[in-house]
A protein has these predicted regions:
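Low-complexity, glycine- and small/polar-enriched segments
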Residues: 1-498
Length: 498
């Protein structure tokens, strides 16, 4: 490809948007026995790729009118699922619902090989998968009422921006390799059971978010050909939205942000010049479950919620030469390698069991685990720059509130709640096996973790016994670290490792 004139543009773009709206309703009634069920499944599985491979742009003429090159992949997915189940009968009523929602997607923007002399290069992969679920269920029987619900919501999201395969790129302005992902799950469910003799209600929810968001220059492995990228930092720069303020991370049990459907972590925009390798990801998961059962002799309500978050955010330069073709130190642009990872997880569980003359049992469990690896790394590379910054940042917040109540007029009121909130994150900034000729060097890793958990367990009886049990387990095994090893650094300014 040869530029026809100044301001020429080359664009490779892949954009995909998917939306599923699912409504399921099941209603059953009978004089004696009614059994009603409803099941819904929504699945999204896709790949969105924008690739510029083995392509030369103004290869033979470094003084040509240079082009602006954009390689962009964007994938948005949304599932909205509503389910209503109701059953009523003179003797026994049973209502049960099952919902499974899953999004699996891979989004990539890449430049592989080729020789290019450009004005600007912007490689950008963006993905935003979202699941929203609302479920309501009830069962009322003259003698027995039983209701149950199971919800499974899963997002597996991989986002990659990459320059590799020995590409040789010289840019008068800036180079951006940007990967960005924003994931959301909002789950709301309520069940009600009633029976003249006994009522039982059971609700279970499992919500999982996983995947890797990565921005890379070069290829890992000793046998690979080095990728070369140079930039002078002229022009308008590269737009990023990769930082998140502390106030965006949960720091309370309940407020409008931890409850509201559609709320998400807000990003802060910035513009950077030079060579920008930037990977950032946010995820907001909230699950709200309420379960109530009442019977003359027994009312049993049990509610279980599990939120699982795992995966990684990586920004890496490997086996690469950066600004190697620029002679004067004053003409070398900055090099920024940044990985930012931000998580909010909220679980709210309520169970109420009422037995007028017998036993009322309310049990609830809420589990939130966050396990994310955040890495910003320069490895086995030669870099010349005004400022070289390698930064990793991880911020995670958990809000968990569990209520269990058991009440009986005559007999026993029993309540038990368990809360488990676990952090197991690594946040690393690493310079290893590198040769850096820079004015300033910063290698920093920052980590913020907040856990807010509350339990209420109440068992009471007018005549008889009241028993309440509450258990909370809140470990944090997160490890941050910044290191420089096996590297040669020539610097005329400041060096820092934090």
């Amino acid at each position: 490809i040869e530029s026809a004139a100044a301001g020429a543009a080359v664009s490779v773009s892949a954009v995909d948007s998917s939306k599923i709206l699912n409504v399921a309703v099941g209603v059953g009634g009978a004089g004696k026995v009614a059994v009603q069920g409803a099941a819904s499944t929504a699945l999204v599985n896709k790949q969105t790729q924008a690739v510029l491979e083995a392509t030369d742009i103004d290869k033979d003429d470094d003084n040509a009118a240079r082009a602006d090159v954009t390689v962009k992949a964007q994938s948005d997915s949304k599932i909205f699922n509503t389910a209503v189940v109701a059953a009523g009968a003179g003797t026994a009523a049973v209502g049960a619902g099952v919902a499974v929602n899953r999004i699996v997607q891979q989004t990539g923007a890449e430049v592989q090989g080729g020789t290019m002399n450009l004005q600007e290069l912007d490689i950008r992969a963006v993905a935003a998968p979202k699941i929203e679920t609302i479920g309501v269920g009830g069962a009322v029987g003259g003698n027995v009422g039983v209701s149950g619900s199971v919800a499974v919501n899963m997002i597996a999201n991989d986002v990659t921006a990459h320059i590799g395969s020995g590409a040789v790129i010289a840019v008068n302005g800036s180079v951006g390799v940007v990967a960005q992902s924003d994931e959301q799950i909002s789950n709301y469910a309520g069940t009600l059971s009633g029976g003249g003799t006994a009522a039982v209600g059971v609700s279970t929810s499992v919500n999982q978010i996983s995947g890797t968001t990565g921005a890379f220059i070069g290829d890992e492995g000793e046998s690979t050909v080095k990728t070369s990228v140079s930039a002078k930092g002229n022009g308008s720069g590269i737009k990023t939205d990769s930082t998140v303020k502390d106030e965006q991370i949960h720091d309370t049990l309940i407020d409008k942000d931890t409850l509201a459907m559609g709320s998400q972590i807000e990003r802060t925009a910035a513009v950077q010049k030079g060579i920008v390798v930037d990977a950032s990801s946010t995820r907001d998961l909230k699950s709200f479950l309420v379960n109530a059962s009442g019977g003359m002799y027994a009312g049993v309500a049990a509610t279980v919620n599990v939120n699982l978050i795992e995966g990684a955010t990586d920004a890496k330069i490997s086996n690469a030469i950066l600004n190697g073709g620029i002679a004067g130190s004053g003409s070398r642009a900055d090099v920024s390698v940044r990985a930012g990872d931000y998580t909010n997880s909220a679980g709210f569980v309520g169970s109420l069991g009422i037995g007028v003359e017998g036993a009322g049992i309310g049990a609830g469990s809420d589990t939130n685990t966050v396990s994310r690896d955040v890495t910003a790394q320069v490895a086995d590379s030669d870099i010349k720059a005004q400022a070289l910054k390698v930064a990793a940042e991880g911020k995670q917040g958990i809000s968990s509130f569990t209520v269990g109540m058991g009440a009986a007029g005559v007999g026993a009121g029993v309540a038990g709640v368990v809360t488990v909130s676990k952090m197991d994150n690594t946040t690393k900034a690493v310079l290893t096996g590198a040769t850096a000729d820079v004015t300033t060097l910063d290698v920093e890793a920052n980590h913020l973790a907040r856990t807010n958990a509350g339990n209420i367990s109440t068992g009471g009886a007018g005549v008889g016994a009241g028993i309440g049990l509450s258990v909370g387990v809140l470990p944090d095994d997160s490890v941050p670290g910044a290191e420089v090893r096996g590297s040669t650094v020539n610097s005329s300014g400041n060096q820092s490792r934090t």
